Each structure stands twice: as structure tokens, then as C-alpha cells.
Amino acid sequence: SALTGAGGTHLCGSHLVEALYVVCGDRGFFYTPSKTGIVEQCCHRKCSIYDMENYCN
């Protein structure tokens, strides 16, 4: 899986949403593509599982 390790990976669009489902699980997450936060961090640059956890509810 692209999520292994903390080195980081590029995740965009549906791949990013899917990764958030995996990382956040039952907690859920907030994903607002209009706000650049997670897209900027994970799509334009690289982010890790630990970065994504910041977007869980």
C-alpha cells in the first residue's frame, strides 16, 4: 500500500479520500478540497500517515 512507512507519498483526489478512510477509520475526517490544506500537503507535496491523522475528526 502507498501508506506504508512515514516517508510520505503523493495522494490526490479519490486516492487521498481513500487513504483518509483507512487512516481515520471510525473517527471519520473532514475533507474540503476547496480549502488547500490537505490537498496542498498531500497532493502537491508529500504527506505521511501522521500528517493525515491531523485531518481526522
Curated annotation (Swiss-Prot):
Check the record and name the CDD domains matching this protein: IlGF_insulin_like
Where primarily located? secreted
Cystines in this chain? 12-43, 24-56, 42-47
Highest taxon of the lineage: Eukaryota
Taken from the record, one Pfam family name reads Insulin
Q: Which GO terms describe its biological process?
A: glucose metabolic process
Recorded hits in PROSITE patterns, A to Z, give: INSULIN
The UniProt similarity line reads: Belongs to the insulin family.
What is the protein name stated in its UniProt record? Insulin
Which species does the entry assign this protein to?
A: Petromyzon marinus
